[in-house]
Regions:
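Mature extracytoplasmic enzyme cores
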Residues: 1-11, 16, 31-42, 60-288, ...
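Hydrophobic targeting/anchoring helices
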Residues: 14, 91-95, 102, 301, ...
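Glycine- and acidic
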Residues: 16-22, 50-57, 184-196, 283-295, ...
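Hydrophobic faces of well-ordered beta-strands that scaffold small-molecule active sites
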Residues: 17-21, 47-49, 82-85, 223, ...
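Active-site mouth loops of central-metabolism enzymes
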Residues: 18-30, 385-388
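Active-site beta-loop-alpha junctions enriched in small/polar residues
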Residues: 23-26, 52-54, 87-90, 227-232, ...
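Catalytic domains of carbohydrate-active enzymes, especially glycoside hydrolases
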Residues: 31-52, 70-74, 81, 309, ...
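Conserved, well-ordered alpha-helix/loop/beta-strand core segments that scaffold catalytic motifs
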Residues: 207-217, 293-321
C-alpha cells in the first residue's frame, strides 16, 4: 500500500500523461528533439506520435521511420515512453492509402434501392452524401438480387426474391458497391474492415515496418500502438415504410457464404426483413442474425487480428472504437463495442469535448475486468478549446479515475 500511495503521489513515466504529439509539417530532427525536451519539462511521461493533416514528410517512408527511431532513442535516454499510432490521421485501417490502392481491400457495402442503376437519373445518384467511411451511393455496383415488395399498413406483408429476368411490381434492388476514393484517404478509400486479409495487409505496411525499425523497444520504451475509430459503412434505415430512397448497410463479397455457413440459411433470400418490420409483432430472426454476424465478422477481421499480432510481438494494442456511447450509435457504426475489446491488450475509449459518457467508460472498464486486463486507455481533453483551464483538465481525469 505504501508503494502504491507513493506511485500515486509521484507517478513514474508509465503512469503520466502521453499526449497526441502532432506531426503535421515537414519534419525536422532539430525541431522534434526540441519538442521532446519541452514535453519532458512539462512533466509528461511520454508522447503518442500522431500524424495530422499537413504532414509533408512521406508517411512511413525511410525519412519518417528514421525520425521515429531517433525519437525512440531520445525517449529511452530521457526515461520516457513513445506510444505508436497506426495511421495517417483516422479512421485506422487504410494505411495512409497504401492498403486501399488495391481494390481487393477497399471498403464495401450493400445498397438497397428502389432505383435500377441502369435507368436512374443523376439527381437520384446524388441523393446520398457523406464521408467515404460512411458510404455513398455511386450507381456502379454489382447486382446481387431483386425483390418484389408488398407493404400493408406500414408492414412488410409479402416479399419474394425475383429470378433473373423475372418481372414484378414495386421492385427493389440490392447492389454491392466499393467505397469511393477521397482526399481524406490520400485519394484512395477506406478499408474493408470485414476482411481479415485487408487487416493483414494493414499490418504489413504499418506494424511490420515499425517492428523492423524500433521493434527491439516493443514492450519497453514502446508499450503500445493506438488504433483509432475503426468502423464499417454506417447502417442506414428508411424513415418510414413507404419511403423511396437508397439505404446502405455494411456488407462484403463473401458475407452471403459465411452467413449461410453460420446460420444454415441465405441472407439475401430474406434481405427485405432487415429494412421493414414484419406484421403481427413477428420478430425477424434474419435481422438479428445479420447484426450478430456482422459484429463477429468485424471483430474477428480487425481487432482480433491486430491484437493477435501485437501479443506475439510484445506490444499492446490500445485505442478506441467509433461511436461508443449508446447501443444505437454502436449498432450503426461498429455493431457493439465490447465484442471488439477482447482483441485489445489495453481497451480504450474516447472522451472528447469534456463530455460525460459514463456508459462509454464503464463498458470498457467492464470488458477489461472480464478479460483480466489491468489497464484502460482514455483519449481525453481533446476538442475543449484554448479556454479549457486546469480545473477542467483535473475534473475530466478525476471522474474517470473515480469510476
Amino acid at each position: 500500500m505504501e508503494n502504491y500511495l507513493k506511485e500515486f503521489e509521484h507517478p513514474s513515466s508509465r503512469f503520466r500523461g502521453a499526449p497526441f504529439w502532432a506531426w503535421n509539417n515537414k519534419l525536422s530532427e532539430d525541431q522534434l528533439m526540441r519538442q521532446t525536451d519541452y514535453l519532458k519539462q512539462m512533466g509528461l511521461g511520454g508522447y503518442t506520435i500522431h500524424c495530422r493533416t499537413g504532414l509533408d514528410t512521406p508517411y512511413m517512408g525511410p525519412e519518417f521511420l528514421g525520425l521515429v527511431k531517433k525519437i525512440v532513442e531520445k525517449a529511452k535516454k530521457d526515461g520516457m515512453h513513445v506510444y505508436l499510432y497506426d495511421e495517417d490521421r483516422w479512421p485506422s485501417g487504410f494505411g495512409g492509402g497504401m492498403v486501399t490502392r488495391e481494390d481487393a481491400y477497399r471498403g464495401r457495402y450493400l445498397v438497397f434501392t428502389p432505383f435500377c442503376q441502369e435507368t436512374r437519373t443523376s439527381t437520384e445518384k446524388d441523393r446520398i452524401t457523406g464521408s467515404s467511411a460512411a458510404g455513398k451511393v455511386q450507381g456502379n455496383g454489382r447486382l446481387l438480387a431483386r425483390y418484389e415488395i408488398s407493404l400493408k399498413d406500414g408492414y412488410l406483408s409479402e416479399y419474394r426474391r425475383l429470378a433473373d429476368g423475372e418481372e414484378g411490381t414495386n421492385i427493389w434492388y440490392a447492389y454491392l458497391e466499393l467505397s469511393p476514393k477521397s482526399p481524406w484517404f490520400n485519394n484512395e478509400s477506406y478499408v474493408n474492415t470485414l476482411d481479415k486479409k485487408a487487416t493483414k495487409r494493414f499490418i504489413e505496411v504499418t506494424h511490420e515496418k515499425y517492428l523492423q525499425t524500433v521493434g527491439e523497444e516493443f514492450g519497453g520504451v514502446i508499450p503500445s500502438i493506438f488504433t483509432d475509430e475503426p468502423q464499417f459503412t454506417h447502417k442506414q434505415t428508411l424513415g418510414k415504410a413507404e419511403e423511396k430512397k437508397d439505404v446502405l448497410i455494411p456488407y462484403t463479397d463473401d458475407f452471403e457464404d459465411t452467413f449461410c455457413k453460420t446460420y444454415g440459411e441465405s441472407f439475401l433470400d430474406h434481405l427485405p426483413e432487415v429494412f421493414w418490420e414484419l406484421p403481427d409483432g413477428q420478430i425477424s430472426l434474419t435481422r438479428y442474425h445479420y447484426h450478430d454476424h456482422l459484429a463477429e465478422r468485424f471483430a474477428e477481421a480487425y481487432a482480433d487480428t491486430l491484437g493477435s499480432w501485437c501479443e506475439s510481438h510484445r506490444i499492446a494494442l490500445t485505442g478506441h472504437m467509433m461511436a461508443e456511447p449508446t447501443l444505437g450509435s454502436q449498432t450503426g457504426a461498429l455493431s457493439e463495442a465490447m465484442r471488439h475489446y477482447r482483441g485489445f491488450q489495453v481497451p480504450g475509449i474516447d472522451m472528447l469535448c469534456d463530455l460525460r459518457e459514463y456508459t462509454t467508460a464503464k463498458q470498457a472498464q467492464s470488458a477489461a475486468h472480464q478479460m483480466g486486463r489491468n489497464e484502460v486507455t482514455s483519449e481525453l481533453y481533446g476538442v475543449t478549446n484554448w479556454d479549457f483551464d486546469f480545473i477542467g483538465h483535473k475534473l475530466q481525469g478525476d471522474w474517470q479515475a473515480a469510476l
